Amino acid sequence: MRYGFTTGSCAAAASKAAAYMLLTGKRKTEITIETPKGIPYTAQLVDIVRSEKEVSCAVEKDGGDDPDITTGTLIYAKVSCVDCAMEAKQGHPQIVIDGGIGVGRVTKPGLDQPVGNAAINHVPREMIEKEVLQICSLVDYKGSLRVEISVPEGEGLAEHTFNPRLGIVGGISILGTSGIVEPMSNQAILDTIKVELNQRKAQ
């Protein structure tokens, strides 16, 4: 059976590509990242929109042979300069990550992210930051960048997930610990049960 890639991997790939196009001025049609599992992921880029201060692009989620409702969904990343002309005060790039349309927002304690944050879990956040910093290093950019992840179909898809029950409103979560989706794995259900138990403990 064919494995797929998580929403976190898609978000990281789109973020890396958007950062590359913004900071180099060159167009990309595909990008490769390394997943936490060590398996490389080469993503095709679609719906590329470029301007001087921001670039957005999308990656189509491929769940492999896993019956995942997000398969075929476009995961977008928009990368913009906070101030392209200035270096960050710390002397190294600062990456700010947030969720846009179709990415859920946390409203209850006990989840991976604090209340008020976008439901982009810590491993995808680390993946996004790592890939974007790699591009910053490539071009010796030391300023600040804002990364916004969005999923236009996310709000509708979220109705078919555990998110409403967990207090995540407005969209899906950006998930993944290994970066890949193993076909017919029970891990996602076990992870959701664990999250719900942690949440009850926090209340």
Stretches with model-predicted labels:
Residues 1-166:
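Generic N-terminal targeting/processing segments that precede catalytic cores or assembly contacts
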Residues 152, 156-159, 163-203:
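Glycine-rich anion/phosphate-binding loop at the beta-strand->alpha-helix junction
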